[in-house]
């Protein structure tokens, strides 16, 4: 096992890297591709990110090939089929890597140690190695040959959305970075900008970040609000609805589709718009519930952040990798056996407003999780831009996966790294929230809250507090780059 790169830095260096996150002006991007045009680009791996980034890059006029394992080619596995069906040239690493100018490693995190060792031995002098997640560099601490430039382009969404937004002549917000230990030719940033442009990221906003900031914020977001809290909230809300006597198909429909419908409002107006979709009475109640949830969940969120920063989380997960994912598989089976996952498909139709009216608790969970994750990342030294993308921005995208095939789909789409952290969060949060669930009132979940007399002073205070939260301010700034973002008819 390598030596954790982040832990090798002194305190000052850690803060500098965590705080690295600057929005790049649109004028700095060009679709002429002065560096990458005509260059030989090889993507290693053809999963969701690999395929869809490659399609976008080819449509942008770049030369893209795929390097796969020999067994994958001989056995004609799904990765080979995806590449061939889309008319890409496919070969082994031994065949394609020695002549590549840019090698993009888009294999799963747990394979990086071996894959990167193979790539380094094959890459030509002064070539470029790219990643879309910095886990291997930061947490495992793998050393890369000094003549190789190491860069990262990390789209802030699943690979399918990278492609869909590109086809709409738009893109998805993207983080780019250059590994400070591997930029001897001082070309890393310009190459990363061209790669980000080739996949359409420049149309939605590109942030110049660091490997450390991307990894630490990404791990925190996916473990807590993005995956961990949605998974915990799904099981808790479904079980509560059943205990109240609701039909299982109504319960599963409200929860499974509710996350997607409710978080759709976040894309266009943040938490402010989400709360504005509630009646005044419901807004006051949701505000109280979300504050209660923040107090309960704060210690868990802080522990996850602390363990991510120290490397304790990654160390334990990598030990589980070496144990054939034993713990991950146990947790995975446990979630698959929950009543929420086992309920048959629901054919009930609910109108959009019913999800807000009957899912008040879900609104409260979302606000609590987004604000808490954002606040704790800021406390840790992470910049507001990074914290926003890893708390609020990606939430609707993860909710979309639950709407398709519940938690099974979410855990299938996200990385094993994200899934491990999500299950770890569930183990702590689920039992901790049991007492809270027993305090819920009629109208909090499954039933519409009856309107009551409103205190204008209280309502004004709540509206002002929500709108003035830092996540709302930075959200307004960053969403200006996403005015063309598509609206999903998700109910």
Swiss-Prot record:
<dbReference type="InterPro" id="IPR008927">
    <property type="entry name" value="6-PGluconate_DH-like_C_sf"/>
</dbReference>
<comment type="pathway">
    <text>Amino-acid biosynthesis; L-valine biosynthesis; L-valine from pyruvate: step 2/4.</text>
</comment>
<dbReference type="InterPro" id="IPR013116">
    <property type="entry name" value="KARI_N"/>
</dbReference>
<feature type="binding site">
    <location>
        <position position="218"/>
    </location>
    <ligand>
        <name>Mg(2+) 2</name>
    </ligand>
</feature>
<feature type="binding site">
    <location>
        <position position="77"/>
    </location>
    <ligand>
        <name>NADP(+)</name>
    </ligand>
</feature>
<keyword id="KW-0677">Repeat</keyword>
<feature type="binding site">
    <location>
        <position position="394"/>
    </location>
    <ligand>
        <name>Mg(2+) 2</name>
    </ligand>
</feature>
<feature type="domain" description="KARI C-terminal knotted 1">
    <location>
        <begin position="210"/>
        <end position="354"/>
    </location>
</feature>
<keyword id="KW-0028">Amino-acid biosynthesis</keyword>
<dbReference type="InterPro" id="IPR000506">
    <property type="entry name" value="KARI_C"/>
</dbReference>
<keyword id="KW-0100">Branched-chain amino acid biosynthesis</keyword>
<dbReference type="GO" id="GO:0009097">
    <property type="term" value="P:isoleucine biosynthetic process"/>
</dbReference>
<keyword id="KW-0460">Magnesium</keyword>
<feature type="binding site">
    <location>
        <position position="69"/>
    </location>
    <ligand>
        <name>NADP(+)</name>
    </ligand>
</feature>
<feature type="binding site">
    <location>
        <position position="390"/>
    </location>
    <ligand>
        <name>Mg(2+) 2</name>
    </ligand>
</feature>
<keyword id="KW-0521">NADP</keyword>
<dbReference type="GO" id="GO:0000287">
    <property type="term" value="F:magnesium ion binding"/>
</dbReference>
<feature type="binding site">
    <location>
        <position position="222"/>
    </location>
    <ligand>
        <name>Mg(2+) 1</name>
    </ligand>
</feature>
<comment type="pathway">
    <text>Amino-acid biosynthesis; L-isoleucine biosynthesis; L-isoleucine from 2-oxobutanoate: step 2/4.</text>
</comment>
<dbReference type="GO" id="GO:0004455">
    <property type="term" value="F:ketol-acid reductoisomerase activity"/>
</dbReference>
<feature type="binding site">
    <location>
        <begin position="46"/>
        <end position="49"/>
    </location>
    <ligand>
        <name>NADP(+)</name>
    </ligand>
</feature>
<feature type="active site">
    <location>
        <position position="133"/>
    </location>
</feature>
<dbReference type="Pfam" id="PF07991">
    <property type="entry name" value="KARI_N"/>
</dbReference>
<feature type="binding site">
    <location>
        <begin position="109"/>
        <end position="111"/>
    </location>
    <ligand>
        <name>NADP(+)</name>
    </ligand>
</feature>
<comment type="similarity">
    <text>Belongs to the ketol-acid reductoisomerase family.</text>
</comment>
<feature type="binding site">
    <location>
        <position position="415"/>
    </location>
    <ligand>
        <name>substrate</name>
    </ligand>
</feature>
<protein>
    <recommendedName>
        <fullName>Ketol-acid reductoisomerase (NADP(+))</fullName>
        <ecNumber>1.1.1.86</ecNumber>
    </recommendedName>
</protein>
<feature type="binding site">
    <location>
        <position position="79"/>
    </location>
    <ligand>
        <name>NADP(+)</name>
    </ligand>
</feature>
<dbReference type="GO" id="GO:0005829">
    <property type="term" value="C:cytosol"/>
</dbReference>
<dbReference type="InterPro" id="IPR036291">
    <property type="entry name" value="NAD(P)-bd_dom_sf"/>
</dbReference>
<keyword id="KW-0560">Oxidoreductase</keyword>
<dbReference type="InterPro" id="IPR013328">
    <property type="entry name" value="6PGD_dom2"/>
</dbReference>
<dbReference type="GO" id="GO:0009099">
    <property type="term" value="P:L-valine biosynthetic process"/>
</dbReference>
<feature type="domain" description="KARI N-terminal Rossmann">
    <location>
        <begin position="18"/>
        <end position="209"/>
    </location>
</feature>
<feature type="domain" description="KARI C-terminal knotted 2">
    <location>
        <begin position="355"/>
        <end position="485"/>
    </location>
</feature>
<keyword id="KW-0479">Metal-binding</keyword>
<feature type="binding site">
    <location>
        <position position="218"/>
    </location>
    <ligand>
        <name>Mg(2+) 1</name>
    </ligand>
</feature>
<comment type="function">
    <text>Involved in the biosynthesis of branched-chain amino acids (BCAA). Catalyzes an alkyl-migration followed by a ketol-acid reduction of (S)-2-acetolactate (S2AL) to yield (R)-2,3-dihydroxy-isovalerate. In the isomerase reaction, S2AL is rearranged via a Mg-dependent methyl migration to produce 3-hydroxy-3-methyl-2-ketobutyrate (HMKB). In the reductase reaction, this 2-ketoacid undergoes a metal-dependent reduction by NADPH to yield (R)-2,3-dihydroxy-isovalerate.</text>
</comment>
<dbReference type="Pfam" id="PF01450">
    <property type="entry name" value="KARI_C"/>
</dbReference>
<dbReference type="InterPro" id="IPR013023">
    <property type="entry name" value="KARI"/>
</dbReference>
<feature type="binding site">
    <location>
        <position position="159"/>
    </location>
    <ligand>
        <name>NADP(+)</name>
    </ligand>
</feature>
